[in-house]
């Protein structure tokens, strides 16, 4: 299965590694030298989590990002799914 949050749709992003040497001028240094940029990936912090749905009387397993899990713990699963225009039936 893909490395993707099933609720928010967050997935791996791509960017650059930027190596920096030296002290910046505003911090009292001569200058800061930036080396060769190389490609890198930013992976999503995914967690396999089991949620109990009292309306259905059963549990569902969802792969969620840590950020989404924080929001779910604050406002609840039903409210978070409604906010992201998802339905519980999609995860059964």
UniProtKB/Swiss-Prot annotation:
SUPFAM superfamilies per record: L28p-like
Q: Which GO terms describe its cellular component?
A: ribonucleoprotein complex; ribosome
Question: Signal sequence: where?
Answer: none
Q: Which domain of life is it from?
A: Bacteria
Any one GO MF annotation of this record: structural constituent of ribosome
InterPro entries assigned:
Ribosomal_bL28, Ribosomal_bL28/bL31-like_sf, Ribosomal_bL28_bact-type, Ribosomal_bL28_sf
Q: Key word Ribosomal protein present in the record?
A: yes
| Keyword match Ribosomal protein | yes
Q: Which residues form a coiled coil?
A: none
- What biological-process terms (Gene Ontology) are attached? translation
Keyword set, alphabetical order: Ribonucleoprotein, Ribosomal protein
Q: What's the family?
A: Belongs to the bacterial ribosomal protein bL28 family.
Q: State what protein this is by name.
A: Large ribosomal subunit protein bL28
Organism encoding this protein:
Borreliella afzelii (strain PKo)
């Amino acid at each position: 299965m893909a490395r993707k949050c099933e609720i928010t749709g967050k997935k791996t992003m791509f960017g650059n590694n930027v190596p920096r040497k030296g002290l910046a001028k505003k911090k009292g240094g001569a200058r800061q030298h930036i080396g060769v940029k190389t490609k890198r990936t930013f992976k999503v912090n995914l967690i396999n989590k089991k949620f109990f749905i009292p309306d259905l009387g059963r549990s569902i397993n969802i792969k969620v990002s840590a950020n989404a899990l924080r929001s779910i713990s604050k406002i609840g699963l039903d409210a978070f799914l409604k906010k992201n225009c998802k339905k519980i039936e999609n995860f059964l």
